């Protein structure tokens, strides 16, 4: 068996500057140097060496649905929800109930919201 570890998420984005601003403001990620190339792809640090790569594709068609998402965990989910509310970022539970969290069968609490390109992001307290 080959052991794997998570490395990065790469997303095609229409406007890389708008997306960078969103992820820095909403998720409070830090931009880091793109060490792979001199392209216009920009990188953000998620934590523990994990990264989010934003690849500019202004003409790409981006199709999304809630089942295709990435999830981040925080021990302070309710504080994060207040942060979203202050920024007027709409969020919902899995069933699309606005301004509501969802408690899974295993007790984990989660919410969902979208970035400027329509990508779904789950934030939960599974930490």
Model-identified regions with their sequence ranges:
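Vicinal oxygen chelate
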Residues: 2, 5-15, 45, 62-127
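Conserved beta-strand in the GNAT
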Residues: 52-55, 122-124
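Short secondary-structure boundary/capping segments
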Residues: 1, 34, 43-44, 60-62, ...
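Structural preference for long, well-ordered alpha-helical segments within the folded cores
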Residues: 21-22, 83, 117
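Short, charged, low-hydrophobicity "junction" segments
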Residues: 22-28, 56-70
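Core segments of cupin and vicinal oxygen chelate
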Residues: 11-51
């Amino acid at each position: 068996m080959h052991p794997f570890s998570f490395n990065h998420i790469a997303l095609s984005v229409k406007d890389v500057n708008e997306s960078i601003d969103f992820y820095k403001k909403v998720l409070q990620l830090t931009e880091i140097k793109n060490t792979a190339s001199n392209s216009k792809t920009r990188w953000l640090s998620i934590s523990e060496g994990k990264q989010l790569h934003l690849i500019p594709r202004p003409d790409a068609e981006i199709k999304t649905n809630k089942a295709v998402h990435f999830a981040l965990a925080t021990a302070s989910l309710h504080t994060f929800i207040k942060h979203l509310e202050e920024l007027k970022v709409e969020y919902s539970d899995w069933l699309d109930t606005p301004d509501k969290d969802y408690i899974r069968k295993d007790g984990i609490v989660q919410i969902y919201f979208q970035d400027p390109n329509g990508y779904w992001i789950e934030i939960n307290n599974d930490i």
